[in-house]
Amino acid sequence: MEEISLPLLTKMSSERTLAVQAALMQQPDKSLALLAWTLCLNVFGSGAYSKPAQISLECKHYSLTSDAPSGKEGAAFMALMAEKARLAALLPEGWSRDMTTFLSLSQEVLLSLLSFCTACSLNGVQTRECGHTSRSPLDSLETAIGFHMRDWWQPTRGNYFGALKKQQIIAALNEAGLSDAAWDAEKMKKGDAAEHAEFHMKDNRWVPGWMCAPRPQTDTTERTDNQANAA
């Protein structure tokens, strides 16, 4: 992964974070489990609290949409904002000044609010220190919710391939099982190779390996999933 530039790492891990947020939002049971687990880390771990309900949530949508190539026009962010608008319309009048207004909400609405807010708290932006790239904190969550990046993102020259070196574009085509397309790209200039890759990747499910959760070592068949879908 270290061959991927830090700016591209930031851009694509931001894109990935928004996509996982949108996917988690659609699975309230998994979102609630994540919330409970996160709270238990504090409750059953070390440390004591002198104030009730010391819970905090930080939504990173501003920085995520600033860094992600799709910005505010991406499918994931638009889905998140559509759900936010739907839920905002269900909030009781004066809710921000009086907690008891939430007592009138149905369990269904409360669950939707918990699920959405938990999803918005995700932050999977990766960093690089001393030449070592941090592991994505989204890996195990993605596996739990059956997440696939291509449900929310389409690789293009503008949002991905154009930021790669020519040999990385060729490697991506080979990784996707498109050896003939990779061979043709060898003879092209970088810009043409990026467009070439966009065209040949448009109908498959390929995702850069470094943007995916690690596959179980015992499952050799899943490791060829990209190639099988690209064939």
Language-model features, listed with the residues they occupy:
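C-terminal helical accessory/scaffold domains
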Residues: 1-190, 201, 209-231
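Segments that shape or occlude catalytic/ligand-binding pockets
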Residues: 197
